[in-house]
């Protein structure tokens, strides 16, 4: 397991804005009285979305107070799960899956594209601090390998050229279309076979 440390530069304060507070209260209301600490993961995610895709220490302290639980417990959860970013990742956070199915299908080319367009090293912000990238474990879209996730969207069936095009779009302020880049609908077969009924016995 990799060592995960919070960013050195931290904001002094954090609090939920009105929409985040509403979302947090809805989540907490789903738990019995005295069990609201179970909402910690959801509230960390809400805080991350509000704070430009990362969670500062001030947010962890705020959530601890909000849920009436020890700060160290919130810190333990936030630093354990890699879905929580402990330092700034920019407006566009690119996650490239490099688990076996994606790697077999050419994920290394997607990594090359990220190094060319964003930075040579993982978790290193682009010069204007708008974007960063990192390799991640399985994102659950193996049938559409290789693929990457940008913020909340999946981009699938990629190669280096298509990845460069997508990165060019986000860096120029455009919104690329998520989904398959081989024209597939969801995870249909690449050769468009819809049935096995016409296959002859071996």
Predicted feature residues:
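Signature of N-terminal electron-transfer/Fe-S-associated modules in redox systems
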Residues: 1-202
């Amino acid at each position: 397991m990799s060592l995960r440390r919070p960013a050195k530069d931290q904001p002094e304060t954090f609090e939920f804005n009105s929409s985040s507070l509403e979302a947090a209260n809805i989540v907490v209301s789903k738990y019995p009285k005295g069990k609201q600490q179970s909402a910690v993961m959801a509230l960390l995610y809400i805080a991350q979305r509000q704070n430009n895709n990362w969670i500062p220490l001030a947010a962890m302290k705020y959530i601890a107070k909000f849920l009436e639980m020890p700060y160290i417990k919130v810190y333990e959860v936030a630093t354990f799960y890699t879905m929580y970013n402990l330092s700034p990742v920019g407006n566009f956070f690119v996650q490239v899956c490099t688990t076996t199915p994606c790697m077999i299908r050419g994920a290394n080319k997607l990594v090359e594209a990220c190094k060319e367009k964003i930075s040579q090293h993982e978790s290193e912000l682009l010069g204007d601090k708008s974007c960063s990238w990192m390799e991640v474990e399985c994102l659950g879209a193996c049938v559409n390998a290789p693929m990457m996730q940008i913020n909340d969207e999946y981009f699938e069936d990629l190669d280096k050229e298509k990845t460069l095009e997508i990165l060019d779009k986000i860096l120029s302020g455009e919104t690329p279309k998520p989904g398959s880049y081989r024209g597939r609908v969801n995870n249909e077969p690449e050769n468009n076979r819809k049935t096995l009924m016409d296959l002859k016995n071996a």
